[in-house]
């Protein structure tokens, strides 16, 4: 028996647009999709789903009980809205991991620890930071089958990891420099440059440990790089025993969420 869903997207415009595209391509039977404006959209910003315009609602005027699922991409300042939505009976997908540190909220990497979804105490499911998700996909089998003495992760972060404003800023700086126009000396240079990310890594390590308690010694290094989309990572694993690489290769090949390609 199929079930038609009412779904709300709560995010900035660019992310709402991407989420709507992804849901349209999914196998979910969505009867109605709505957008709750985390920040007010401009007049020309509209979302379409299945060739129809999507209803847009102000955040403070939303009746959360209208929805079955809410994809919420707010920060900690929006936590009260997230809690209200969960208390209204809908399942909240916490896309930015605001509730990831709460003991009674599962932190899920799809296909890796789905068993944590069996009991939902708060109607909230948190997703890890993208750095953590990508790292967990890359080492899941190693983590399950080996004792790792040290794990080092270097993440090369694109502009889109921060927000759409940073993407536009990188595009503007790139065009400016290619046209021979120097940047303002007081301006943080993004184009044709790399620099350490100021974001704290403590929460990243804590999220990894919540998913894999045996990985309590993960160290993240973050580098902001001049690319628009796509995050790369370099991972170093240390163990007193020899690794079985084939087990991890088989895990990648068997996972529909991993696009595994052998080096040519």
Where are these predicted regions, by residue range?
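N-terminal Rossmann-like NAD(P) cofactor-binding subdomain of oxidoreductases
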Residues: 1-188, 214-218
């Amino acid at each position: 028996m199929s079930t038609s869903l009412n779904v709300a997207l709560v995010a900035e415009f660019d992310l709402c647009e991407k989420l709507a595209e992804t849901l349209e391509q999914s196998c979910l039977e969505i009867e109605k999709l709505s957008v709750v404006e985390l920040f007010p959209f401009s007049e020309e910003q509209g979302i379409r789903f299945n060739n129809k315009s999507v209803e847009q609602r102000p955040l403070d005027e939303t009746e959360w009980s209208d929805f079955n699922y809410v994809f919420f991409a707010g920060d900690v300042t929006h936590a009260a809205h997230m809690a209200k939505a969960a208390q209204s009976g809908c399942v909240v997908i916490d896309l930015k991991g605001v509730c990831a540190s709460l003991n009674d909220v599962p932190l899920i990497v799809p296909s890796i620890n789905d068993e944590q979804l069996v009991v939902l105490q708060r109607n909230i499911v948190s997703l890890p930071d993208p750095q953590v998700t990508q790292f967990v996909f890359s080492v899941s089998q190693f983590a399950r089958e080996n004792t790792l003495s040290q794990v080092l992760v270097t993440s090369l972060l694109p502009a889109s990891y921060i927000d759409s404003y940073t993407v536009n800023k990188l595009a503007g700086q790139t065009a400016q420099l290619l046209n021979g126009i120097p940047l303002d000396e007081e301006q943080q240079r993004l184009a044709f440059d790399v620099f350490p990310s100021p974001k704290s890594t403590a929460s990243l390590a804590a999220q990894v440990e919540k998913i894999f308690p045996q990985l309590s010694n993960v160290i993240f290094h973050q580098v902001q790089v001049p690319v628009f989309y796509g995050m790369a990572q370099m991972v170093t694993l240390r163990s007193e025993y020899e690794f079985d690489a084939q087990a991890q290769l088989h895990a990648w090949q068997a996972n529909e969420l991993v696009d595994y390609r052998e080096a040519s």
